[in-house]
């Protein structure tokens, strides 16, 4: 495995794209064996100009225009532009460590039939809200068993962030589903595993990620995750992961419990007991992340945003895709 391609989808990332590209330039891997494809979705800020300036100085950095302005189309645009042995998916908000590529190559030797490897994300907080969100997303209570955020050991997993893929994976199972606004990476990894490949988490594969500091954007993001997960399930006629069901059940409990509580005092009592238990467990989980009571309470609030938004999106997705049998369309309200 010698040649490597890095694909970066982006749009309006003038604040971050330079840092991302600098981290790649500072990598110790032989640049003669590396190509970087930044797939820009017609940015309206200075992102394109920044990418062009880098590409003029470094022959291995290339700008591609993502005409459809969708993430999966951008990914496929970059992946199909290159025939390298290994292809890495990277985010514009990310920076990789100097030995990132070497450790990806090394990790492929740990198990037979590995199709993808990845590592641990280290959060970089730009403000207090970003730090709260980052803490919540580093908790198993917040995001389930997303090992690239919470994992403490190397081993097989069902998904990773900023994964490196063998070329043969794309040759066998195809590319990212361009119908999906969200969850295209989860859907792709599901197909990868279904076709006999494995995904490996190696903690020495390290990257930094600049966490967005907005509760409203977090809500929208996780609503979309839940909504589009239903479409993925319908398409493959299976529930791709068990952990996705829990926020959905939580939202059903909230709505159902409120209605039943209006009909019976016993149901109201039961509803309040279980609801109180949720907050107790949430606070205990938050207490492991910070000694500050104020920060703990904000993390608990973030837990609720994560669970409620994902669960509500999942519920609406079931209604749209299974009950109303809606077909896919590019809804602007659900795009990034």
Task: Report residues per predicted region.
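Cell-envelope/extracellular polymer assembly enzymes that use nucleotide-activated donors
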Residues: 2-5, 35, 187
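Catalytic donor/gating beta->alpha subdomain of glycosyltransferases that bind UDP-sugars
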Residues: 171, 177-240
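Glycine-rich, basic loop-to-helix element that forms the pyrophosphate-binding segment
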Residues: 66-82, 103, 157-160
């Amino acid at each position: 495995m010698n040649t490597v391609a890095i694909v970066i989808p982006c749009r309006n990332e003038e604040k971050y794209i330079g840092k991302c590209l600098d981290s790649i330039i500072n990598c110790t891997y032989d640049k003669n064996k590396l190509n970087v494809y930044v797939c820009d979705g017609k940015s309206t800020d200075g992102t394109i100009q920044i990418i062009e300036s880098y590409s003029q100085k470094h022959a291995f950095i290339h700008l591609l225009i993502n005409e459809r302005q969708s993430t999966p189309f951008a990914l496929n645009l970059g992946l199909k532009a290159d025939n390298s042995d290994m292809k890495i998916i990277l985010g514009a908000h990310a920076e990789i460590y100097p030995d990132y590529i070497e450790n990806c190559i090394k990790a492929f030797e740990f198990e037979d039939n590995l199709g993808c490897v990845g590592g641990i994300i280290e959060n970089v907080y730009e403000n207090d809200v970003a730090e709260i969100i980052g803490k919540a997303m580093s908790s198993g209570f917040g995001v389930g068993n997303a090992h690239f955020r919470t994992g403490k050991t190397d081993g097989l997993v069902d998904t990773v962030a900023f994964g490196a893929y063998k070329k043969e994976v794309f040759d066998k199972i195809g590319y990212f589903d361009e119908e999906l606004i969200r969850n295209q990476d989860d859907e792709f990894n599901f197909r990868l595993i279904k076709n006999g490949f494995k995904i490996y988490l190696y903690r020495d594969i390290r990257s930094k990620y600049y966490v967005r500091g907005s509760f409203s954007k977090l809500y929208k993001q996780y609503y979309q995750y839940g909504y589009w997960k239903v479409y993925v399930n319908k398409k493959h006629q299976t529930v791709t992961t068990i952990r996705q069901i829990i926020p959905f059940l939580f939202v059903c409990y909230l709505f159902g419990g409120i209605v039943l509580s209006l009909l019976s005092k016993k149901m109201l009592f039961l509803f309040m007991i279980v609801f109180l238990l949720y907050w107790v467990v949430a606070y205990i989980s938050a207490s492991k992340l910070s000694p500050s009571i104020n920060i703990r309470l904000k993390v608990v609030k973030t837990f609720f945003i994560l669970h409620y938004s994902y669960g509500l999106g999942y519920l609406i997705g079931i209604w749209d895709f299974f009950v109303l049998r809606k077909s896919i369309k590019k809804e602007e309200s659900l795009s990034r």
